[in-house]
Amino acid sequence: EAVFKFTANQEKEHGKIFYNFLKEMTGENITIDGSYPVDIYDDVLKLLRSAQHNEFEEFEPVYPDFAAVANQEGFTNIGAKFNQIAKIEKTHGDRFGMFADLLEQGKLFVSDVEEEWMCLNCGYVHKSSEAPKSCPVCSHPQGYFVRLKLAPFTTL
């Protein structure tokens, strides 16, 4: 869940950037035409893989195509933002793919070597080759643990 929320917050910021461009056109009529896939699954692996696919689609071809149209219409600053954000979408796709790979390999909560695992709820760090089944501090389940090196805002 945390990887989806973390990414969604970044996507929200992308939306704000484009919303601010729209605000500059207040009072005008513009046409916006687009579609977006609806991928709702109960299976986490399917969610991760579809998120990976959709982020890669935004990376190439969707956002570069939007950038080209913006540039053709004289909105070079908007085109530049689409190109910059496209690169971020690739990072999102890579992240979803990494977690999907770990899940497929049965290594999301298990490692071949000793690692530090962080509870994303309370910050408890556990050193072992496997994340605990539940956090000994806050009792949240294993799903709240990530490798410390993958936890947001950590410096190693």
Predicted regions and their residues:
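Non-heme di-metal
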Residues: 1-156
